C-alpha cells in the first residue's frame, strides 16, 4: 500500500513538473509571437512615415535593440549558437541609447537655480517671522545668536532646558 501511494505521489509530482515546463515554453513562444507582431507593426508604421514625409525627419530608434534575452529563453533557434556573456553584455547592448544633444541634468528653476539672488529675500522673510513670534527676545539677542543658542540646546551641549533659550 505504501509503495503504491509513493509511486502515485511521484507520478503526480512528475506530471506537475512537466506540465509547468510545457506551460512555460508555450507562454514564452506566445510572447515571442506577440513581440514579433509589435515589431512588425512598428516597422510598417515607420515605413509608411518615411513614404509620407519627403523632408528629412528624425527617425525613431528600432525596438529590436530593446528586445530582452529573456524572450528567447526556450527558443531553440537562437539558443543553438548563443553563449552566456554575463550581465555586462546585457547592460551595454540593451541599455537606452545616449542622446548627447540633451543635457544629462534637469534645468533648475526658481530659488534653486539662483540661490544668491533669492537668499536676501529668504533671510528677510525669516527675520519677519521671528520678529513676529519672539518680540520679547528680539531686543535681547541678535537673530544669529538666538539661532546658535537654539541649535546648541537641541544638540544637548548646554545643560539647561530648551525653553530657557
Curated annotation (Swiss-Prot):
One of its GO terms (molecular function) is type 1 melanin-concentrating hormone receptor binding. PANTHER family: MELANIN-CONCENTRATING HORMONE, PRO-MCH. This is Pro-MCH. The modification Isoleucine amide is found at residue 143. One of its GO terms (biological process) is feeding behavior. The keyword Signal applies. Belongs to the melanin-concentrating hormone family. The lineage of its organism: Eukaryota, Metazoa, Chordata, Craniata, Vertebrata. The keyword Secreted applies.
